[in-house]
Amino acid sequence: MATIFSGGSVSPFLFHTNKGTSFTPKAPILHLKRSFSAKSVASVGTEPSLSPAVQTFWKWLQEEGVITAKTPVKASVVTEGLGLVALKDISRNDVILQVPKRLWINPDAVAASEIGRVCSELKPWLSVILFLIRERSREDSVWKHYFGILPQETDSTIYWSEEELQELQGSQLLKTTVSVKEYVKNECLKLEQEIILPNKRLFPDPVTLDDFFWAFGILRSRAFSRLRNENLVVVPMADLINHSAGVTTEDHAYEVKGAAGLFSWDYLFSLKSPLSVKAGEQVYIQYDLNKSNAELALDYGFIEPNENRHAYTLTLEISESDPFFDDKLDVAESNGFAQTAYFDIFYNRTLPPGLLPYLRLVALGGTDAFLLESLFRDTIWGHLELSVSRDNEELLCKAVREACKSALAGYHTTIEQDRELKEGNLDSRLAIAVGIREGEKMVLQQIDGIFEQKELELDQLEYYQERRLKDLGLCGENGDILGDLGKFF
């Protein structure tokens, strides 16, 4: 990690991928459920090749009134494992399933349960984790048959072995995975001491770390956060509809009021097909348009071949040893940033807004420090949007390029080697690792190329002093000095 910038040790790139430690699930981690109904499990859309657990689960949904004769999809074995396949032609925005709120797993369900009292002060995601663990152990749980179809683990990197994680050597995803696992472990150990042990009768014995990671993985991969007034909800059957990069909208899940049984009304989780689908084809949704491949790997255990999903996070920091620390921090905070700022850079996209101004702020020093005076406080960010001085611009370019080269040196393979490996028959986890390595390096090379080009243009850039002189009418369009400047300095 290079020490850069005048006035202190600033490490702009900590190779950090997740922003903070609030692991309330991100956007819709979806897969949804279907509804059918008929006289037998086979007649409501299941197939003989489905496991007994899935068939039992389907029958339970039928008994709960979730599956009706009108349900246009069936559970089927597909390339991804299980999925939803159309029983008939489905038009775009057709409703394919509805699930009543009484079957949702969310903080309200926790609050209404026997453990609600002891979980009332917990972060919502932690209370739901405890609820999942407890309900899975109960023979009389409403969700017994739902838990029967859930996997013990997925290909999410939180479940990888040490040997498998070594394939991510040098990557941000490896560091993020280790950080997430350590964070979850610490939170769950606190839960054990503060909630489980003082209330042993409410929880299974023992509750292991594996139980915590199972529940965390279920929540991370299945929690849906885009319903009205619902930030954390798991909907049974939400893990059967699969993701497709071909779906480019996320507007497919709704909370509606409707019939939830023969004589009852309730809020319903309603899922619409985002695309027109022919009978026999699989129905897909888009899990999240904004997630990088690293986030997809961490949350769901897969990546897309789409290069635009490749990303790298630059972490910039104002060093406390910087002689202008207080002023720089004030400027950063006044413009929506903090002492540490994270910038996600995606392949084939422009640099994110705020990155260059923040870099220039961190690098600011020497004769450029006058911009930190209170006189400029309301206008400094506008000045930082443009090049300040040659020294400042050269310093930030050098810092970024050195950080990129340092990061690239941390991988144990080259892009060419990764691409050669991809031609082989890789298992799912190795394929993820190779794809992540390749993608991160592609973005790092892109960043390095951007700032290499900026270095080549340093002599052609217009800097603050030249712009100021032009504003005063003392500098021509070609940069020629006009008149006697002595009286202005």
From Swiss-Prot:
Binding site residues for S-adenosyl-L-methionine: 80-82, 222, 242-243
A single MF term (Gene Ontology): protein-lysine N-methyltransferase activity
EC code(s) of this entry: 2.1.1.127, 2.1.1.259
Keywords from the named record: Chloroplast, Methyltransferase, Plastid, S-adenosyl-L-methionine, Transferase, Transit peptide
Keyword flag Transferase: yes
InterPro entries according to UniProt: Rubisco_LSMT_MeTrfase_plant, Rubisco_LSMT_subst-bd, Rubisco_LSMT_subst-bd_sf, SET_dom, SET_dom_sf, SET_RBCMT, SETD3_SETD6_MTase
Residue ranges of every copy of the SET domain listed in the record: 64-288
Principal localisation: plastid
A Pfam family recorded for this sequence: Rubis-subs-bind
Single Gene Ontology BP annotation: methylation
Transit peptide, UniProt annotation: 1-37
Expression tissues: Highly expressed in leaf.
Residues given in the record as substrate binding sites: 222, 226, 239, 254, 287, 300
PROSITE patterns in the cross-refs: SAM_MT127, SET
One GO cellular component term: chloroplast
Catalytic activity field: L-lysyl-[ribulose-1,5-bisphosphate carboxylase] + 3 S-adenosyl-L-methionine = N(6),N(6),N(6)-trimethyl-L-lysyl-[ribulose-1,5-bisphosphate carboxylase] + 3 S-adenosyl-L-homocysteine + 3 H(+); [fructose-bisphosphate aldolase]-L-lysine + 3 S-adenosyl-L-methionine = [fructose-bisphosphate aldolase]-N(6),N(6),N(6)-trimethyl-L-lysine + 3 S-adenosyl-L-homocysteine + 3 H(+)
Top-level enzyme category: transferase
Subunit structure and binding partners: Homotrimer.
Function text: Methylates 'Lys-14' of the large subunit of RuBisCO. Can also use with lower efficiency chloroplastic fructose-bisphosphate aldolases and gamma-tocopherol methyltransferase as substrates, but not a cytosolic aldolase.
Family under the similarity heading: Belongs to the class V-like SAM-binding methyltransferase superfamily. Plant protein-lysine LSMT methyltransferase family.
Protein name, per record: Ribulose-1,5 bisphosphate carboxylase/oxygenase large subunit N-methyltransferase, chloroplastic
